């Protein structure tokens, strides 16, 4: 039976794992790395590069190299955080027809789920290469604080990649699974502090033994889906730009190529300063003006970096305190603090965590791999391979509908364990009202306009009656993926309307199907391209081999034999230029057949030479080995014992 893989679809890096027996295993990609950069590049020849290969060419192709796309997934173009990103990304963020934030590359508008799907395809292929069988099912992780639109968009990305997403699981919960599965330390409450490339989550989780079952119950979760390592990088970039402007008067923000080089340098400097006190950013020929080329050389100390990002680190404290309060716990109730996400390697972040929770965070969890491992364990649970594990997750934000006066009436409170169902009866606001609009909202504000709109639908044909008389039952149903289904029913007529919430933004079914087909077509194109490369290589190797042999043994051939081989060589070289696989294969075969005579001559020559050498060798051996008469031959003997 095919396995369900676990994928950590990260902002900066992604990781894939699978259950092998009772143990989760992180799978290395084709480049031998355990994590893959979540970077997708669109090259000139329509080739799509993913991971390390995309990252390598980013400096020469900044406008078409897409990174940190997870920050845009499920977001509207007008959102403040999106507008902020537009000013710092070398690629173009554009408004889609449905007002979502999309990206433009090579003149084509691309939806974030379609870009993320390319990363998932790479993860899927990594798993297939390792397992030696097709993979069609996956558990994919998302930040705990992702709203409904973002979860739906992640699920869409999975479908575009050809994966059936069996479960969407929260990243801190996955990390808790990875941490707690083997621990036999009794009941304990843990805090998972997850500061990744683009998002921050804090989850308070209770791990308990309940009737022989390992139970992971999320008590509360909080976070910020636009706070992560990318923001730390941006602060360093801004500092470097300011320093260079002071020195040269040139603003590098207007130069996309320079901006991409700065991004790489800022990330490297940030990482270096986790283990050293000072580093220097050296970027020769960063730009040029009338006076000639300009070079950037800026020293950054760890103290300077910490002052640049201090406010970002401080922003993580609020959600931590809120999560503790929502869980009804104090700091002293927390047994362990787990760090997840690459940004938690920064010493200042670890200091902050210690300050918030009053204890040293644990260092025995790999912050880059724990989430994928947890997703693989959840895959094992769903498959039935992992027994006695129960995962109780929560919805991160309250859900409700807009009611009279523009107020949000909550049906499901935040931190409610999922799956869950809630229902409430509402009525009409006007006399003889025959239709109602159900406007679904997600958030914590009392005023409807202050919350995220997830979508709306109408319930029509309500019999005319005075206001307040009709009884309309609204049911909210959240599935195990944290995705909402809403229905409204007129209790008098039994008429019902229901929707799986797809935000007024989001991708339509037709768009998803088109993207699925595009991804499949691209996979077919890739296969054809690979087959063509293989045929070319084979033909090229054959041409090289025959030419070499012809130079050495051509004089042994009859005139017509030699000219036949030369003609076949010429045709094979012409075929190589054509780029047509069938032609190349046919001409390679023709060259192979034409060179048979040459191979025979080579073989005969080699045999003759070998015979002559053997004869000469025997004669000389006899003359050398025969002792002169009367001469004593001394010999040393060594006893060789048989190995027992």
From Swiss-Prot:
Region of interest (Disordered), ranges: 597-644
NCBIfam families: PRK00290.1 (NF001413), PRK05183.1 (NF003520), prok_dnaK (TIGR02350)
Gene transcribed to yield this protein: dnaK
Lineage: superkingdom: Bacteria
GO MF term list: ATP binding; ATP-dependent protein folding chaperone; unfolded protein binding
Protein name from the UniProt record: Chaperone protein DnaK
Modified residues annotated as Phosphothreonine in this record: 199
Native organism: Nitrosomonas europaea (strain ATCC 19718 / CIP 103999 / KCTC 2705 / NBRC 14298)
InterPro entries according to UniProt: ATPase_NBD (IPR043129), Chaperone_DnaK (IPR012725), Heat_shock_70_CS (IPR018181), HSP70_C_sf (IPR029048), HSP70_peptide-bd_sf (IPR029047), Hsp_70_fam (IPR013126)
Keywords assigned by UniProt, alphabetized: ATP-binding, Chaperone, Nucleotide-binding, Phosphoprotein, Stress response
Pfam families xref list: HSP70
Similarity remark: Belongs to the heat shock protein 70 family.
Comp. bias regions, Low complexity: 604-617
Function field: Acts as a chaperone.
Factors inducing expression: By stress conditions e.g. heat shock.
Lineage summary: Bacteria, Pseudomonadati, Pseudomonadota, Betaproteobacteria, Nitrosomonadales
């Amino acid at each position: 039976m095919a396995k369900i893989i676990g994928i950590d679809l990260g902002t900066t890096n992604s990781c894939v794992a699978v259950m092998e027996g009772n143990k989760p295993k992180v799978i290395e990609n084709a480049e031998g790395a355990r994590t893959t950069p979540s970077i997708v590049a669109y090259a000139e020849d329509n080739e799509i590069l993913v991971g390390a290969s995309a990252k390598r060419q980013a400096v020469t192709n900044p406008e078409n190299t897409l990174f940190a796309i997870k920050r845009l997934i499920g977001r509207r173009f007008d959102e403040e955080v999106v507008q902020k990103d537009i000013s710092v990304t070398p690629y173009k963020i554009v408004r889609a027809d449905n007002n979502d934030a999309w990206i433009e590359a090579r003149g084509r508008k691309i939806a974030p789920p379609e870009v993320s799907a390319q990363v998932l395809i790479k993860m899927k292929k990594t798993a297939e290469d390792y397992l030696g069988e097709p993979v069609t099912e996956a558990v994919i992780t998302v930040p705990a604080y992702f709203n409904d639109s973002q979860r739906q968009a992640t699920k869409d990305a999975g479908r575009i990649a050809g994966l059936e997403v069996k479960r969407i699981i929260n990243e801190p919960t996955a990390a808790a699974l990875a941490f707690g599965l083997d621990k036999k330390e009794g009941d304990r409450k843990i805090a998972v502090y997850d500061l990744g490339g683009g998002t921050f989550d804090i989850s308070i989780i209770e791990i308990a033994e309940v009737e022989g079952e390992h139970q992971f119950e999320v008590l509360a979760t909080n976070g910020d889906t636009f706070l992560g390592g990318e923001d730390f990088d941006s602060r360093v970039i801004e500092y470097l730009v300011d320093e260079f402007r002071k020195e040269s008067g040139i603003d590098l923000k207007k130069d996309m190529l320079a901006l991409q080089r700065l991004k790489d340098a800022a990330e490297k400097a940030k990482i270096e300063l986790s283990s050293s006190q000072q580093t220097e950013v050296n970027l020769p020929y960063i730009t040029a003006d009338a006076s000639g080329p300009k070079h950037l050389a800026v020293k950054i100390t760890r103290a300077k970096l910490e002052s640049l990002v201090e406010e970002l680190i401080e922003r993580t404290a609020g959600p931590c305190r809120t999560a503790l309060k929502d869980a009804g716990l104090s700091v002293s109730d927390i047994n362990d603090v787990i760090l997840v996400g690459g940004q938690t390697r920064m010493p200042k972040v670890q200091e902050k965590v210690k300050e918030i929770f009053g204890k040293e965070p644990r260092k025995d969890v790999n912050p880059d791999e724990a989430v994928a491992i947890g997703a693989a364990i959840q895959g094992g649970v769903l498959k039935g391979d992992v027994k006695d594990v129960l995962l109780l997750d929560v919805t991160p934000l309250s859900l409700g509908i807009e009611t009279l006066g523009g107020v949000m009436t909550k049906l499901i409170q935040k931190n409610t364990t999922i799956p869950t169902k809630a229902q409430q009866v509402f009525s009409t606001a006007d006399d003889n009202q025959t239709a109602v609009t159900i406007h679904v909202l997600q958030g914590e504000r009392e005023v409807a306009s202050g919350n995220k709109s997830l979508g709306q639908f109408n319930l029509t044909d309500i019999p005319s009656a005075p206001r307040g008389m009709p009884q309309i039952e609204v049911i909210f149903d959240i599935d195990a993926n944290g995705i909402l289904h809403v229905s409204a029913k007129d209790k008098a007529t039994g008429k019902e309307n229901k929707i799986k919430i797809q935000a007024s933004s989001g991708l339509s079914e037709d768009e998803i199907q088109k993207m699925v087909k595009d991804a499949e077509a691209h996979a077919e194109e890739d296969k054809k391209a690979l087959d063509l490369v293989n045929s070319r290589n084979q033909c090229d190797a054959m041409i090289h081999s025959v030419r070499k042999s012809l130079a050495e043994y051509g004089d042994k051939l009859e005139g017509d034999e030699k000219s036949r081989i030369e003609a076949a060589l010429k045709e094979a070289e012409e075929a190589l230029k054509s780029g047509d696989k069938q032609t190349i294969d046919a001409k390679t075969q023709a060259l192979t057949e034409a060179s048979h005579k040459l191979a025979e001559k080579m073989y005969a020559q080699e045999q003759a030479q070998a015979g002559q050498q053997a004869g000469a060798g025997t004669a000389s051996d006899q003359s050398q080995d025969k002792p002169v008469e009367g001469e004593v031959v001394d010999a040393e003997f060594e006893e060789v014992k048989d190995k027992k």
